Amino acid sequence: MTSGHAELQDRVPMSTTWFIAKEYLKRLEIDFEEHGRTTFSVHPEKHIETKVIEVFPGKNWITLTTRLMDLDELPPKGRKVVYEKLLKANATLVEVNFGIDKKNCLTLRNAAPVTGISYDVFNCTYEAHLAAIKFFFEKMKDQLLQE
């Protein structure tokens, strides 16, 4: 097997995953944009403060990621307390996790495994993501900014 063939073989499942993710997003009846065959930007409706949820269909996982806030907004003195609160939130909201990306933004992330993927699994992953966004903006953001 040539190297090029192996690369093509590695890309086929992701392409299939991309089509699956697109179909599930359509079934959710939500607005989204396609970015080539690599990602989707979902624009959640009603009562959600965030503007975009990025959906990354990969070979093994379909990952949802949202930037929640720029951590440069936080006072440097209170960051340790903020990080502790985020770790506790990770323990409370086991379906999702909070993290920090390369641009120093607080992110929310969760994923569904491609193996055994179904519309119900994808929908549960999406709903958990929305619930965590709501939790962050209703219960955490103001507290974090006060630290």
Question: Where is each model-derived feature located?
Answer:
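A short acidic-to-branched-hydrophobic micro-motif
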Residues: 51-72
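Short, highly charged C-terminal tails/helix-capping segments
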Residues: 141-147
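Charge-rich, low-complexity N-terminal segments
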Residues: 1-50, 92, 101
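Well-ordered alpha/beta subsegment
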Residues: 95-127, 138-141
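Short amphipathic alpha-helical signal-transduction/dimerization elements
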Residues: 87, 91, 130-141
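Short, internal acidic amphipathic alpha-helical interface segments
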Residues: 65-105
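Hydrophobic residues embedded in beta-strands of well-ordered beta-sheets
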Residues: 38-40, 62, 105-106
